């Protein structure tokens, strides 16, 4: 068993990707835009210039930062009362804690939103470190946010699990040198990430079972 585990947040810990897609669609409909099928996959787990390019591509706006800020503010408003957990999250966190694995969240979301979601969901006490990639120059699929998280945990990346739901996130975890586990949400695993060594689980409960069995 590894000594550290680094969790993505949206779509992995919390069932929030559907909320974000709902908000993006509402903003699109208000502008008379129909989002293509690829939007959910492209927008997931991106930040920085990559995020801006996706917003411009689908919304044809000259102010992608302003639109993203509006989406985030609406998400904050809706998540203040309740943050839905993905099945198996509590069981996995309890298991890792019982086995003295140190835990971090590493998300592309702004730090205030990460902390708010952890607090509202009552998951905050589980985590030793909370890392945001929102201000990094290089976002996923670059490994920077996970390398930062491993450094904050004072562990080599090779002694950490990364748990992700998106292709970009998985590629970032693999590039960081972590044992990377994908639990798909909107994105299905590709042959590329399988060939690069990503582990695929259908749920967080399966992650726990396979760690317990010594597979990871």
Residue locations for each model-derived region?
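Asp-based, Mg2+/Mn2+-dependent phosphohydrolase catalytic module
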Residues: 1-3, 94-97, 110-216
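N-terminal helical cap/lid subdomain that shapes the substrate entry/recognition surface
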Residues: 2-99
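Short glycine/serine/threonine-biased micro-segments
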Residues: 9, 42, 102, 131, ...
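Residues at secondary-structure transition points
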Residues: 15, 38, 42, 46, ...
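Hydrophobic beta-strand core positions in alpha/beta domains
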Residues: 104-105, 182
């Amino acid at each position: 068993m590894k000594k550290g585990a680094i969790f993505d947040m949206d779509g992995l810990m919390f069932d929030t990707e559907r909320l974000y897609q709902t908000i993006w669609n509402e903003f699109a409909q208000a502008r008379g835009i129909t989002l293509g099928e690829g939007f959910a996959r492209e927008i997931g787990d991106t930040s920085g210039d990559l995020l801006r390019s996706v917003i411009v591509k689908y919304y044809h706006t000259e102010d992608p930062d302003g639109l993203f800020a509006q989406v985030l503010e609406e998400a904050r408003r809706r998540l203040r009362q309740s943050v839905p957990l993905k099945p198996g999250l509590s069981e996995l966190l309890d298991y890792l804690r019982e086995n003295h694995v140190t835990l971090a969240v590493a998300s592309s979301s702004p730090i205030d939103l990460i902390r708010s979601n952890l607090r509202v969901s009552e998951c905050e006490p589980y985590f030793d470190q909370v890392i945001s990639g929102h201000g990094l120059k290089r976002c996923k699929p670059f490994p920077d946010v996970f390398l930062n998280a491993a450094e904050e945990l004072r562990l080599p990346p090779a002694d950490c699990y990364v748990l992700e739901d998106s292709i970009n996130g998985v590629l970032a975890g693999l590039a960081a040198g972590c044992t990377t586990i994908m639990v798909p949400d909107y994105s299905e695993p590709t042959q590329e990430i399988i060939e690069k060594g990503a582990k695929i689980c259908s749920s967080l409960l399966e992650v726990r079972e396979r760690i317990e069995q010594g597979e990871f």
